[in-house]
């Protein structure tokens, strides 16, 4: 077999492949064995017609398409290896010759990975992130944890305040006419949650139980119900009940409830500070890495093939479908609710898809330029890490994946990202840890 590659404009080229006649004849033999089982010829049992009779009656041409189907996949794969090209989409194939006793010749128009022209990726200026945990951040985390233990208590006296949960009846109207979905009784609303039309919750502050009030608001211009968008509405509102969160005091007992390894408040704070500091350092490093990746990608010049963007869009739509499935929705239901279709969703995702493709190509090109590879030791460490994280044996992970190619590539790219950050110049007058 011989193959030649002729580069064309952009990211396309013409692959011309010639398969020797002897392979063609073998493929025709295989094709005959397949086809003869499916035909009936008077005077012969089904599947027993001799080859000469078959060709006399139907012509050898009746075997050509099956022979092509047999020859093409292997021939195309070998041609890719021989010419060392990297296709990014299915080729457009045109058969130029298929005939008994002659070579099989076909041409394939192939879209290949684009040329990546790297810009600066070392010495990038990135902002050094704060890693020191403040006392305020620690207290905020403590308050947040205590908030989960809070109990809702009825406010016997007093007025509605931000953070309270009020039980209300309301009836909304526009131009004196009630509208669908604008009425409810016994509705619980947390003041400050932002779950109602802007301005509604704030107007309830200061009200007392059994008090009634006309709450006047204006629907946002981008409101999902077009007939209400931008219009002023009046909600006749009555407060039935007011509840507030009663947050427990941090005691040794509560500290142990929040952290089984802490027996005192001080131990709880110490453990929490350590965890938060570690997380803040990790988050800071990730932000710095993301900035380095973005700048390295921005400095790279690539003519991205549309086929690669479409492949990434397919992946993103699939990921989106999985996410909404966890919320009990399928794509078609989502489209009905949102008023979108798949083409509109893909259009919304297109910029992100292009950026993903460009980033992946950039990081891969840097790995090649720097001769970065994942060693067996690197892969073993990553497998051990995954084993601990998901509580699965290394062998089970290997069996699930089939091979370690995905892990190998992930580790390789992570090494590139580390290189970008390690070689960056940190600004804002701070220094790297």
Swiss-Prot record:
A Gene Ontology BP annotation from the UniProt entry: protein transport
SUPFAM superfamilies cross-referenced by the UniProt entry: FKBP-like (SSF54534), Triger factor/SurA peptide-binding domain-like (SSF109998), Trigger factor ribosome-binding domain (SSF102735)
EC class name: isomerase
Keyword Cytoplasm attributed: yes
InterPro entries to which the protein is assigned, alphabetical: PPIase_dom_sf, PPIase_FKBP_dom, Trig_fac, Trigger_fac_C, Trigger_fac_C_sf, Trigger_fac_ribosome-bd_bac, Trigger_fac_ribosome-bd_sf, Trigger_fact/SurA_dom_sf
Disulfide bond sites: none
Cleavable signal peptide: none
Role summary: Involved in protein export. Acts as a chaperone by maintaining the newly synthesized protein in an open conformation. Functions as a peptidyl-prolyl cis-trans isomerase.
Domain remarks in the Swiss-Prot or TrEMBL record: Consists of 3 domains; the N-terminus binds the ribosome, the middle domain has PPIase activity, while the C-terminus has intrinsic chaperone activity on its own.
Stated name of the protein: Trigger factor
Species per Swiss-Prot/TrEMBL record: Staphylococcus aureus (strain bovine RF122 / ET3-1)
């Amino acid at each position: 077999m011989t193959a030649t590659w002729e580069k064309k404009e952009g990211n396309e080229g013409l692959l011309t492949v010639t398969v020797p006649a002897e392979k063609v004849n073998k493929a025709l033999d295989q094709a005959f064995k397949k086809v003869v089982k499916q035909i009936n010829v008077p005077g012969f049992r089904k599947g027993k017609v001799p080859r000469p009779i078959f060709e006399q009656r139907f012509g050898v041409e009746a075997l050509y398409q099956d022979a092509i189907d047999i020859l093409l996949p292997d021939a195309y794969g070998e041609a890719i290896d021989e010419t060392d090209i990297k296709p990014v989409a299915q080729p457009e194939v045109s058969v130029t010759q298929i005939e008994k006793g002659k070579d099989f010749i076909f041409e394939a128009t192939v879209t290949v990975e684009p040329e990546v022209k790297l810009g600066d990726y070392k010495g990038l200026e990135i902002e050094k992130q704060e890693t020191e945990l403040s006392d305020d951040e620690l207290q905020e985390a403590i308050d947040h944890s205590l908030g989960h233990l809070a109990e809702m208590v009825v406010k016997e006296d007093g007025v509605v305040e931000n953070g309270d949960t009020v039980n209300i009846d309301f009836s909304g109207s526009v131009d004196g006419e009630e509208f669908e979905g604008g009425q409810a009784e016994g509705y619980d609303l947390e003041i400050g949650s932002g779950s109602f039309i802007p301005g509604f919750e704030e107007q309830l502050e200061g009200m007392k139980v059994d008090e009634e009030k006309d709450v006047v608001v204006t629907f946002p211009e981008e409101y999902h119900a077009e007939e209400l968008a931008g219009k002023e509405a009046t909600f006749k509102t009555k407060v039935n009940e007011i509840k507030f969160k009663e947050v427990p005091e941090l005691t040794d007992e509560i500290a142990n409830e929040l952290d089984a390894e802490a027996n005192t408040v001080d131990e709880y704070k110490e453990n929490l500070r350590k965890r938060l500091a570690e997380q803040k350092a990790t988050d800071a490093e990730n932000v710095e890495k993301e900035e380095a990746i973005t700048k390295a990608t921005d400095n790279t010049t690539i003519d991205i093939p549309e086929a690669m963007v479409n492949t990434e869009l397919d992946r993103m739509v699939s990921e989106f479908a999985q996410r909404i499935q966890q919320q009990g929705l399928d794509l078609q239901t989502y489209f009905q609710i949102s008023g979108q279709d798949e083409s509109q969703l893909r259009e919304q995702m297109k910029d992100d898809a292009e950026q993903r493709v460009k980033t992946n190509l950039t990081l891969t090109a840097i790995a090649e330029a720097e001769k970065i590879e994942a060693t067996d030791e690197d892969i073993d460490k990553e497998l051990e890490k995954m084993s601990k994280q998901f509580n699965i044996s290394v062998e089970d992970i290997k069996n699930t994946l089939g091979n370690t190619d995905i892990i190998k590539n992930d580790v390789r790219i992570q090494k590139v990202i580390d290189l970008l950050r390690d070689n960056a110049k940190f600004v804002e007058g701070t220094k790297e840890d």
